[in-house]
């Protein structure tokens, strides 16, 4: 797990006002306040538990036309974002979803799998010098990582509805029904569990769910 160093806040010192402004912009434009991505075989093409080596920048695969890192290498395996993921992050980086923020909810199996995933996020890019990790950090205070819930080591678990999402709710201060969750798990229904178990008391609603869109 990436432990949150600070509670959910915006980039400058006037965090409460910025949080309110961000939420207002999201509401005005009909966007969720928090867009949450599963990672393995959803955001990108690989399962981190099957890999054994941390991704190093010296091994990156760079697209010669765009000078952008399109592949992070773990051993002999290349980790690539799905085109839908790349498009979503690019549009977000370009400011097409004002007020929304990004997060991850990934139940990577082992501490090593978590580290490999984190290294892939640091190396993969949507534009020259713009890493996926840096896009996930947009809108949050420097050093805040409470939006990046990766792994299943306590307090996380394999059950995202019981751990990942309650932790995201706590550290981002964003209500469940104002979240959108992308997950295409084919061995269990994380989406249904999150939608039914993570319900905001006053609204009576859980996160909106989207299956498999990341592959488009």
Map each language-model feature to its residues:
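Asparagine/serine/threonine-enriched low-complexity, disordered tracts
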Residues: 13-17
């Amino acid at each position: 797990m990436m432990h949150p160093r600070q509670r959910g806040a915006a980039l400058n010192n006037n965090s409460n006002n910025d949080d309110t402004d961000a939420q207002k912009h999201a509401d005005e434009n009909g966007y969720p306040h928090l867009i949450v991505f599963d990672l393995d075989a959803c955001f990108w093409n690989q399962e981190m538990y099957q890999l054994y080596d941390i991704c190093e920048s010296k091994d990156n695969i760079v697209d010669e036309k765009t000078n952008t890192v399109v592949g992070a290498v773990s051993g002999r395996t290349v980790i690539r974002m799905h085109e839908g993921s790349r498009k979503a992050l690019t549009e977000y980086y370009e400011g097409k979803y004002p007020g929304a923020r990004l997060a991850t909810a990934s139940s990577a199996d082992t501490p090593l799998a978590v580290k490999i995933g984190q290294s892939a996020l640091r190396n993969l890019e949507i534009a020259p010098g713009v890493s996926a990790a840096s896009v996930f950090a947009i809108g949050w205070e420097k050093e805040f990582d409470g939006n990046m819930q990766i792994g299943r080591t306590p307090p996380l678990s394999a059950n995202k509805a019981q751990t990942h999402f309650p932790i995201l709710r706590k550290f981002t201060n964003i209500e469940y029904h104002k979240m959108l969750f992308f997950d295409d798990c084919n061995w269990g229904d994380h989406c249904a569990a999150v939608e039914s178990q993570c319900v905001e008391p006053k609204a009576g609603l859980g996160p909106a769910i989207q299956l498999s869109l990341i592959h488009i």
